Design a protein with these regions (language model features):
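Glycine- and aromatic-enriched mobile tails/lids
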Residues: 1-7, 24, 37-39, 47-53, ...
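N-terminal Rossmann-like FAD-binding beta1-loop-alpha1 element of flavoenzymes
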Residues: 9-32
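Conserved N-terminal glycine-rich FAD pyrophosphate-binding loop of Rossmann-like flavoproteins
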Residues: 36-69, 73, 239-242
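Short beta-strand to alpha-helix junction loop
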Residues: 76-89, 123-141, 152, 200-208, ...
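Conserved redox-cofactor binding core of oxidoreductases
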Residues: 96-177, 182, 189, 198, ...
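FAD-site-proximal beta/loop scaffold in flavoenzymes
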Residues: 159-175, 180, 321-363
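Glycine-/small-residue-rich beta->alpha transition segments that form the dinucleotide
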Residues: 185, 189-194, 360
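An anion/pyrophosphate-binding glycine-rich loop and adjacent beta-alpha core
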Residues: 213, 219-328, 380, 389-395, ...
């Protein structure tokens, strides 16, 4: 496209966060950018586990919030955790109103599943492992019928338009070329960073574009070092790799090594139900020691596999693995980014005119390690809060804005980047590897003229090098201890390409501990 379009609100991204936000904005007009045909290539559609919500007998908002805080290893904002749990029931009602067919018990109540690090069964699912696909299908259908939404399919943002420190829309790229969308408010909802790693469960295009674009424009980004590696990606050499949902371990599946030994009890008392970072490191350790890792579902699921977990079953059978009678080979894979563009509790970033929600945002809800099945919930909760803030807000003037599109990364450099990120910024890291990675990425970024993927990788690696402790999804073999005081990390652009660490949360008057500064 070579046109200039205008709208009240521009939503960059068409996953769960972006689409649920767009629907709730009605009747305020908005444009939604979907880089692929609607419903395709969004990581939300691949989510197997479900949505966490404290709906069961004996469960509560306080318990859900406490589990979220515990999983986050000291960095979750307690007020945000409470907000997330408090809004969960209403967001489930939104999905039910759209016709999402969540699994139910014989009495008609919602079926609630147990997942790792949850103290109560509270995950609502669809046909075992089809939650993401079913939710996205319902949202896409509603979006196509919504008169206030203009959908641009096959179009992605490449840079944010800026005018006197205010974000004014985006420079976009589609099948017919580049164009401009001017907007009074712009929302980033583009997903994560898994495509920066060699083994990932994310779409390969998920390379941290929102982080790079926001940082380039001057927004504060935070907690970028915290990458969640899913412990049970199916190890069949696929790119991206399918995963074996957390719910399988919740149902009693065991992790075993080549000797058939269930090994998780050696690493954590919660065994298979330990938090994802703990399980991922255990699987990594077994594989590194040459003992391998398999998920044995034969006793817990067995012959019921096709009906209870159809997505996992199909992925296994396509690789000539029958999980009814064979253990599933597994390995950790880059799955979710806890960091992102820093926002307040209403989804506003540090730049006027710019909001963020979903995986590309850093809301304070995930800390150093996200609680299983909180990601879809967080997308909906903050998408709704942004919509509620913008729907009736006083309209600002449209601004012209300016931006320069960065070059695209070439295939050879991207392949090398993914290898380096997996090796030096993976499940286990150390200072020497991270320092070498920062040097390599910086040189590659300068040589290539600053592609967004390389900028995002440099920011992540720099944050990981700066954090000299082990916490949650960030594990340093040269600094295995956890500091007694938890601290989030915040970065902002310094000059054209430099990075400056902040000494305080941009949305809090309280300074960070002294060790948080560069």
């Amino acid at each position: 496209m070579t046109d200039t379009l205008e709208s009240d609100v521009l939503i960059i991204g068409a996953g769960l966060a972006g689409l649920s936000l767009a629907l709730r904005l009605a009747p305020r007009p908005c444009i939604v950018l979907s880089p692929a045909p609607l419903g395709q290539a969004a990581a939300s559609a691949w989510a197997q586990g479900g949505v966490a919500a404290p709906l069961g007998r004996g469960d509560s908002v306080a318990l859900h919030a406490a589990d979220t805080i515990a999983a986050g290893a000291g960095l979750v904002d307690p007020e945000i955790a409470a907000l997330l749990a408090q809004d969960a029931a209403a967001r489930i009602d939104d999905l039910l109103a759209l016709g999402v067919p969540f699994d139910r018990e014989t009495d008609g109540s919602l079926s609630l599943s147990q997942e790792a690090a949850h103290s109560k069964p509270r995950v609502v699912r669809v046909a075992g492992d089809l939650a993401g696909r079913s939710i996205m299908r319902a949202l896409a259908s509603a979006v196509r019928c919504a008169e206030h939404i203009t959908l641009l399919e096959g179009v992605r943002a490449v840079a944010l338009l800026e005018h006197d420190g205010v974000i004014a829309g985006a420079l976009v790229r589609g099948p017919r070329g580049d164009g401009t969308v001017r907007a009074r408010e712009t929302v980033l909802a583009t997903g994560g960073i898994g495509g920066l790693f060699r083994v990932t469960t994310n779409p390969r295009e998920a390379r941290g574009a929102a982080i790079a674009q926001a940082f380039r424009a001057g927004a504060v980004v935070g907690d970028l070092e915290f990458v969640q590696f899913h412990p049970t990606a199916i190890d069949i050499g696929a790119d991206p790799t399918p995963l074996a949902t957390e719910a399988l371990r919740g149902e009693g599946a065991r992790l075993v090594n080549t000797d058939g030994e269930p090994f998780m009890a050696r690493y954590d008392g919660a065994a298979e139900l330990a938090s994802r970072d703990v399980v991922a490191r255990a699987v990594h350790a077994e594989r590194s020691a040459g003992r391998g890792a398999w998920l044995d579902c034969r006793a817990s699921v067995g012959a019921a596999f096709p009906e209870r977990f159809p997505t996992v079953f199909s992925a296994c059978m396509a690789a000539s693995i029958d999980p009814r009678i064979q253990p599933i080979p597994v390995a950790p894979a880059a799955h979710y980014h806890m960091g992102g563009v820093v926002t307040d509790r209403w989804g506003a970033t540090t730049l006027a005119g710019l909001s963020a929600c979903g995986e590309c945002a850093s809301t304070g809800a995930n800390g150093a390690n996200r609680l299983a099945s909180n990601s879809l919930l967080e997308s909906m909760v903050f998408g709704a809060r942004i919509a509620d803030r913008l729907r009736d807000a006083t309209q600002s003037s449209l601004r012209a804005g300016h931006a320069q599109a960065p070059p695209q990364i070439d295939v050879a450099t991207l392949d090398a980047l993914r290898e380096r990120m997996s090796r030096d910024c993976g499940v286990v890291r150390d200072g020497r590897g991270l320092a070498g990675l920062v040097d390599w990425v910086t040189a590659a970024e300068q040589a290539a003229g600053g592609p967004s993927a390389l900028m995002a990788a440099r920011l992540i690696a720099t944050a990981a090098l700066q954090r000299r402790e082990s916490r949650g999804g960030h594990w340093r073999s040269d600094h295995p201890a956890t500091d007694p005081i938890g601290r989030r990390s915040f970065m902002v652009r310094d000059g054209q390409q430099g990075i400056r660490f902040l000494d305080r949360d941009p949305f809090s008057p309280q300074p960070l501990p002294r060790s948080a500064t560069a």
